């Protein structure tokens, strides 16, 4: 459940900076994405942007997922769990189920190189 509004500043380079903390509660987690975190929302290849934009109903899920993948994330969440959380938020936010599954499959198949191992 979204606990705060997602407020961003467009950096005019395909990236967006949070202007306040974004808080989302899912399962046993309260995920606080900090102010100043930079995201590109969903990393959609240009060829598919006619079908799916990088932002939309999936924006909150994308920001949380980017944060969970980042080195700055203080939560000790493995990549597979981060991807499941992404899928659950997509569903909660009312993203079309087929699109949600496709986005989940995409992060499972192509997200490995972006995941930062927490130490």
Where are these regions (language model features)?
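Extended terminal accessory/targeting regions
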Residues: 1-119
């Amino acid at each position: 459940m979204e606990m705060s509004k997602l407020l961003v500043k467009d950096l005019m380079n395909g990236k967006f900076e949070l202007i306040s903390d974004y808080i989302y509660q899912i399962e046993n987690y309260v995920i606080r994405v900090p102010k100043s975190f930079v995201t590109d929302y969903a990393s959609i290849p240009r060829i598919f942007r006619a079908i799916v934009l990088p932002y939309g109903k999936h924006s909150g899920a994308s920001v949380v997922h980017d944060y969970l993948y980042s080195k700055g994330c203080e939560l000790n969440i493995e990549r597979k769990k981060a991807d499941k959380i992404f899928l659950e938020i997509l569903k909660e936010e009312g993203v079309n189920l087929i699109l949600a599954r496709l986005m989940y499959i995409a992060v499972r198949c192509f997200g490995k190189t972006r995941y930062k191992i927490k130490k």
